[in-house]
Amino acid sequence: MSFPNSSPAANTFLVDSLISACRSDSFYSSSASMYMPPPSADMGTYGMQTCGLLPSLAKREVNHQNMGMNVHPYIPQVDSWTDPNRSCRIEQPVTQQVPTCSFTTNIKEESNCCMYSDKRNKLISAEVPSYQRLVPESCPVENPEVPVPGYFRLSQTYATGKTQEYNNSPEGSSTVMLQLNPRGAAKPQLSAAQLQMEKKMNEPVSGQEPTKVSQVESPEAKGGLPEERSCLAEVSVSSPEVQEKESKEEIXXDTPTSNWLTAKSGRKKRCPYTKHQTLELEKEFLFNMYLTRERRLEISKSVNLTDRQVKIWFQNRRMKLKKMSRENRIRELTANLTFS
């Protein structure tokens, strides 16, 4: 059954159905036309406040004289959302422009509702952020404070901790820990006092320990020197090779005061024998340049040398005597010659 658009029955049916659909908070109707209530309508629900009536057209109708659509502002004043009687009404400023939030460089996190008691009284109204449109006044006093642990309050203790210039003293670190953790303040104080007492107790003990150690080490060193000397003497008596090494070390320690230790060029001679051994061998060489086997064995036993060492020493001494005699002869000959 089709009704023409000019008939009032069709319009009333269309309007009533759309009003019932819109009051049931459904913005999309099943019919072919869409209706939104006028701004003057009293509606308890919050919704889009556009108004207008768009009737449906038949297939063959192009224009109609009664057809029209009244367009109203899409978002009216926010005051019409709620009744003035309600307690949750939000007062709006005159201008609808959202104020720009101007944050200072030092952003204080403590200006929120969860504020400490010591800073609440000092708060100035200018420091409250410009969200007065949403929050008309600061937090009421009835709200309980949120307990914030001590490690969240670093801003109060950072300045004091920074002035210590990163000292390595345990007292400074204990004070910083006291400021950072106010709950355990009594425990670090006791620990700091204990540290001071331990320092005082450790200082004299540490001062006495090095002296004791030095006293213990010095007798050991003093006692070790004669022991080493006696061991060296025993080894020298037992083996002539070790004795030769010992003689080299003694010669290296002694200054070259005598001529028999130094050569003509000033360098130190290679002398594997001790002074006592060389003196005994020199005496025997003055008596006899050539030794028999029996005499060589006797000298080797008296000087603690082997038979072969005594034999080599006499051979070297004879070669040295020949060289010295040759040099003396040449020197005498050159001194007598005169060059014209």
UniProtKB/Swiss-Prot annotation:
GO BP: regulation of transcription by RNA polymerase II
Compartments in which it is found: Nucleus
Coiled-coil residue spans: none
Keyword Transcription: yes
Chain intervals for the UniProt region annotation (Disordered): 199-227
Residues within the DNA-binding region(s): 266-325
Name of protein: Homeobox protein Hox-D10
Regions of compositional bias (Polar residues) in chain numbering: 208-217
Function: Sequence-specific transcription factor which is part of a developmental regulatory system that provides cells with specific positional identities on the anterior-posterior axis.
Similarity field: Belongs to the Abd-B homeobox family.
Pfam families xrefs: Homeodomain
Keyword check for Iron: no
